Swiss-Prot record:
Name of a matching Pfam family: Radical_SAM
Cofactor entry: [4Fe-4S] cluster
Family assignment from sequence similarity: Belongs to the methylthiotransferase family. MiaB subfamily.
Name of the protein described by the UniProt record: tRNA-2-methylthio-N(6)-dimethylallyladenosine synthase
PROSITE patterns per record: MTTASE_N, MTTASE_RADICAL, RADICAL_SAM
């Protein structure tokens, strides 16, 4: 038995891929440890969507060189999107690396590990395959038994936004069969999962190429799984969000009242250069469908500032969009050139100082809106799915007759709350429980409250409780 450590950089898709990698290594008879210094096998699951993510990955791999010199038998593997993009260049740049494996190579990794261990090979595997390896998805690792979790329903992307490398490093869009997805969710629910997030680069186009059921139909089937309390999904491309999907928020009781719908910009001129294939007005119409189907719907988005050619007027249109929509949260990024992405060759690059000013102004606006929306919840009772003990549990102001927990509302707001001892008796409150929490304080990025009740086991549908 060997010990392994996995370091994950990037999106939820990478988190899910790392859980699959953990399951593969566990099935090989190895066990997970908490630090690379303790491990015989060290894997870095990388991201290349932005320059900063690449820097994090290469910096971590560089730190492994000294460990490898001290323990030459240690096997180092680099996987994920950066591995897919750079391939053999990573092997040449980092002599400490033994295996470079791309986004389609997880199922072949056991053979590569054996080849390194027994023959001393150095391996690059960035081959892409048309079919999804369901044998990998069927494995359940030691880290797949949490209250909340991710499941990939598709991989790849066919949209080719001009700033993005995903179609080049994840491949073309391919959907998993609904039966395989449902079986995996049922297995995870049997292990304690209560909230699932369905993952894809564009979940709205699920099944279209293969002639499978629509994404709305898939959600309806997931909604029927006993023991599952909540359903979330990400990411949605605005151009493919349908009235059928919006209507699902009215009919499906487990579907959470939150949608992440990346706008990227509020300017039609910038959206066209990005190849987003929708206009500002079309985007706003999709939001109207969602809010009409589910009043109180929480909305989050992605925004890129400083895209090549973005003028001050373009940026002001983005700020205006944020004011108009009043998002609950925003993931904002400064544009950076990426290898393979067409925008790298675009004229009109925005200088770094201007990008810094724009992202500061954007975040200042959004922080104000988020704080206002959180304060508006004070005095309301929210249903919270308990995920674990709050980091605040050790604070001096937490008294002996209370316990501090954390979880999320259906609108995806973090809620930290105290549970009076009389309510906590009998272990009714714990990870996986659904608790009614009175919000006492709306903070900048979270809510604080006190538990006032606990849902009965099996009372899962809380998607419309805000």
């Amino acid at each position: 038995m060997k010990r392994f450590y996995i370091h994950t950089i990037g999106c939820q898709m990478n988190v899910y891929d790392s859980s699959q990698l953990s399951a593969i290594l566990t099935a090989m008879g190895h066990r997970s440890v908490n630090a690379p210094e303790q491990a015989d096998l060290v894997f870095v699951n990388t991201c290349t969507i932005r320059a900063k993510a690449k820097q994090k990955a290469t910096s971590f791999v560089g730190r492994l060189a000294a460990m490898k010199r001290a323990r030459p038998d240690m096997i180092v593997g680099v996987g994920g999107c950066l591995a897919q993009e750079e391939g053999r260049q990573l092997l040449d740049a980092f002599p400490c690396v033994d295996i470079v494996f791309g986004t389609h190579a997880l199922g072949r990794l056991p053979g590569h590990i054996q080849a390194v261990a027994h023959q001393g090979d150095r391996i690059v595997d960035v081959e892409m395959t048309a079919a999804i390896d369901e044998s990998v998805h069927a494995l359940q690792g030691p880290d797949s038994s949490g209250v909340t979790g991710f499941i990939t329903i598709m991989r790849g992307c066919d949209n080719f936004c001009t700033y993005c490398v995903v179609p080049y490093v994840r491949g073309r869009e391919t959907s998993r069969a609904p039966e395989h997805i449902l079986d995996e969710i049922r297995a995870r629910v049997a292990g304690g999962l209560r909230e699932i997030t369905l993952l894809g680069q564009n979940v709205n186009s699920y099944g279209q190429k293969e002639g499978l059921c629509s994404f709305a139909d898939l959600l309806a089937r997931v909604n029927e799984i006993d023991g599952l309390h909540r359903i979330r999904f990400t990411t949605s491309h605005p151009k493919d969000l349908s009235p059928e999907l919006a209507a699902a928020f009215t009919s499906l009781d487990k579907l959470c009242s939150h949608v992440h719908l990346p706008a990227q910009s509020g300017s039609d001129a910038v959206l066209k250069r990005m190849n987003r294939r929708y206009t500002r007005q079309a985007y706003l119409e999709k939001l109207h469908w969602l809010r009409e189907a589910q009043p109180g719907m929480a909305l989050s988005t992605d925004i890129i500032v400083g895209f090549p050619g973005e003028t001050e007027q373009d940026f002001l249109q983005t700020l205006d969009l944020i004011e108009k929509v009043r998002y609950d949260s925003i993931f904002a990024f400064m544009y950076s050139d990426r290898p393979l992405a067409p925008a790298r060759a675009f004229d009109g690059k925005v200088d770094e100082a201007e990008k810094q000013q724009r992202i500061y102004a954007l975040l200042e606006l959004q922080n104000r809106i988020t704080a206002e929306k959180n304060r508006a919840l004070e005095g309301r009772v929210e249903q919270v799915l308990v995920e674990g003990k709050s980091k605040s549990s050790g604070r001096n102001d937490i008294t002996a007759d209370t316990v501090q927990w954390t979880g999320r509302t259906t609108c995806n707001r973090v809620a930290n709350f105290t549970v009076p001892r009389e309510l906590a008796s009998g272990n009714a409150v714990g990870p996986g429980a659904m608790v009614r929490v009175e919000i006492m304080s709306g903070l900048a990025h979270s809510l604080s409250g006190i538990a006032v009740g606990v849902e009965k086991p099996g009372a899962g549908g809380d998607a419309h409780a805000a």
